[in-house]
Design a protein with these regions (language model features):
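Beta-strand-enriched cores of mature, soluble protein domains
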Residues: 1-149
């Protein structure tokens, strides 16, 4: 199986909304207030209004459920839904929770984004499978997204 880079996506996240314990774990909602993305075939900004509905499971794994709207540099809107997992050693996850920068090789942060585009120029996004590797930042995250060929 081969892949090639699709884009690098950086999202801005203010302090999250902590719902607390729910039947399947601990729910935290992280609003997405903006960001940028850039790749060989598309670039633009992340519109405010999306979010990452995370669930911290009892085994320490964080389930990610990111849903955002991308606006390309020529005004096209693209919906992106990305699901994934983040986990690692307790001391590394504690450092991330404190807002510290942590080497992304020290923890697992993988996603599988899907896209919906109505503009023909970006319709190729509707027909691909992608994978991403994430990096937690003090005020958001960076996702390096590859398309599977």
């Amino acid at each position: 199986m081969t892949s090639r880079p699709l884009m690098t996506l950086q999202v801005e996240v203010p302090p999250p909304q902590k719902l607390g314990p729910v039947p399947h774990g601990t729910r935290v909602i992280a609003p997405i207030t903006g960001g940028v993305f850039e790749g060989r075939r598309l670039r633009g900004k992340v519109l405010p209004g999306g979010g990452d509905w995370t669930l911290l499971r009892s085994d320490g794994v964080l389930e990610l459920d990111l849903r955002i709207t991308l606006e390309t540099d020529n005004g096209a809107l693209i919906f992106m839904a990305s699901f994934g997992l983040r986990h690692g050693p307790p001391e590394v996850l504690a450092a991330i929770a404190r807002g510290e920068s942590v080497d992304p090789s020290k923890y697992y942060f993988r996603t599988f984004p899907r896209f919906e585009a109505s503009v023909e120029k970006y319709a190729f996004l509707n027909r691909m499978i992608c994978v991403g590797a994430g990096e937690a930042l003090p005020d958001g995250a960076i996702h390096r997204i590859d398309e599977i060929l």
